[in-house]
C-alpha cells in the first residue's frame, strides 16, 4: 500500500506543467460555433437572461456578449488564454457592475480555467481595440486589481507587430487599423486562425 501511494504522488504533475499547450499548429485549432446568442426582449426590466453570455469556443478561447437588454449594441468581447497570461479583448458598453458584471464574469471563467489546467496565470491584460463607448465601458471594473493590466491607450510601435502580445507560447499579431478611431487595432491569433476586428469590420445588413 505504501509503495502504491508513493507511485501516485511521484506521478502527480507539478502545478503549471500538466496543461502546457503547444500553440504551434499546421492548421487552425478547432472551435465550437453551435449555439445561439441571446436576442434580448421587448422589456429590459422583465428580461431574465444572464447579463453577459459566455460561450466556450475551445479550451483556451472564450466569447462573451453583453445582453441586448442591458445595452442595445450588445458588444462582443473575447477572452484568450496562453500558458502564462490571459487577454480580454474589449470591455463592453456599460460601466456599472450591477448591470454589467464584466470583472466578476471574467474572474469566474479564469478561475475555472486555472483549476482545469492546473495553471496560475501571471497576468491578465485588458485591451480595447478602439475607444468607442462599446469597447471601453467596463474598463473601470479592472483598474487597481492585482495582476491586471489595462492597456487603454496602447500604441503600436509599427503598423504590424507580430510579437505584440505573448500570452505564453500563444503569440498574437497586432495590426493597426485606424477607422472609427485613430488608434484602432485588429488582433490576429495564428493558433485559431481568427482575426479579431472589433468595430473595424461588420457584416452588412
Model-derived segments and their meaning:
Residues 51-115, 186-200:
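Conserved beta-strand hairpin/beta-sheet module of binuclear metal-dependent hydrolase folds
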Residues 35, 57-64, 167-170:
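Short Pro/Gly-enriched beta-strand edge/turn motifs at strand-loop
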Residues 3-12:
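Sec-dependent N-terminal signal peptides
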Residues 16-19:
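Boundary at the C-terminal end of the N-terminal hydrophobic targeting segment
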Amino acid at each position: 500500500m505504501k509503495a502504491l501511494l508513493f507511485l501516485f504522488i511521484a506521478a502527480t504533475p507539478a502545478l503549471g506543467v500538466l496543461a502546457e499547450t503547444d500553440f504551434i499548429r499546421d492548421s487552425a485549432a478547432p472551435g465550437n460555433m453551435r449555439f445561439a446568442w441571446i436576442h434580448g426582449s421587448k422589456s429590459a426590466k422583465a428580461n431574465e437572461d444572464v447579463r453577459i453570455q459566455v460561450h466556450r469556443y475551445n479550451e483556451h478561447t472564450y466569447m462573451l456578449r453583453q445582453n441586448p437588454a442591458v445595452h442595445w449594441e450588445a458588444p462582443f468581447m473575447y477572452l484568450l488564454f496562453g500558458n502564462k497570461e490571459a487577454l480580454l479583448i474589449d470591455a463592453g458598453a456599460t460601466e456599472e457592475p450591477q448591470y454589467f458584471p464584466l470583472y466578476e464574469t471574467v474572474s469566474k471563467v479564469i478561475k475555472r480555467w486555472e483549476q482545469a489546467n492546473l495553471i496560475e496565470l501571471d497576468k491578465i491584460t485588458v485591451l480595447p481595440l478602439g475607444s468607442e463607448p462599446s469597447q471601453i465601458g467596463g474598463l473601470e471594473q479592472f483598474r487597481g486589481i492585482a495582476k491586471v493590466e489595462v492597456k487603454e491607450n496602447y500604441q503600436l510601435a509599427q503598423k504590424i507587430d507580430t510579437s505584440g502580445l505573448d500570452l505564453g507560447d500563444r503569440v498574437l499579431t497586432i495590426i493597426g487599423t485606424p477607422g472609427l478611431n485613430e488608434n484602432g487595432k485588429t488582433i490576429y491569433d495564428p493558433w485559431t486562425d481568427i482575426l479579431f476586428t472589433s468595430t473595424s469590420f461588420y457584416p452588412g445588413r
